[in-house]
Amino acid sequence: MMSTLFSNSISTSTKRRRQPRFQAVETHMFDPSIKAVLCDIGGVLYVGDTPIPGAIETLDRIKSRYSVRFVTNTTQKTAQQVVEALRSMGFDIAEDEVLTALDVTKLFLKNHDSRGFYLLTDDATAFFDDLNEIERQHYVVVGDAQENFTYERLNKAFRLLQSGSELIAVAKNRYFKDNDYQLSMDAGGFVSALEYASGKEAHIIGKPSHDFYRLACSSMNVEPAECLMIGDDIESDILGAQEAGLKTLLVKTGKFVVQDLESGIMPDFIADSIADIP
């Protein structure tokens, strides 16, 4: 049975882009068109290794009313590893409810019968080991490589691109909220550097890719217009979802900064945290 996802504690706004001011009004809203929810993970459900206050209980309520998928641009963890981490914090989440950019990247490579040169962490690179028998190496795959972002490896990636390989960005986020609760640089800057040097545009696998959002919606047998995206990233979560046809709710936790409200990207709804959803 459908139930309202919104109450007076959540502000709504008309979807307007490139406006000089963010304007929101308080309202009580019942939206019967919403049949499913996509929910970002880091910054929305938890920060560091601590759940957002009220997130566990709120998530249980949402899951009792809607089909839910948890979508994340993490380039360091598989769906199984994400679920293990969330369960250790007290969240009740199944592996088939999680869609990660890393898992979709592996599916992409398999479908294109290719392995990659990986600018990833050692653990993330090991996730692709079963593709090593594929002779064709047609892609440079870039995610958050941390200490593996060396000049030597970046230059090798550049030379492969110059030799004909294509560039894949597992994700292209600017920054993320780190375990010390400060913003840290994400993979996007390194992807942009390789794009600039090689003259090639990266194919983005994760959010804000339309294909990623459509894959998540189709896994619940709903159309994008019937789905709400909850996130803390004004570009990947909000703008990306809007352009894919979803409704959006921005939470002021995680990587959210006040300047996001001046970006001209207008979420359909805004809340202080996921706990404000009744």
Question: Model features per residue range: what roles?
Answer:
Residues 1-2:
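Methionine residue identity
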Residues 66:
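Conserved phosphoryl-transfer catalytic core
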Residues 5-6, 15-39, 44-61, 76, ...:
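Asp-based, Mg2+/Mn2+-dependent phosphohydrolase catalytic module
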Residues 72:
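Conserved phosphate-coupling serine/threonine residues in phosphotransfer and NTP-handling enzymes
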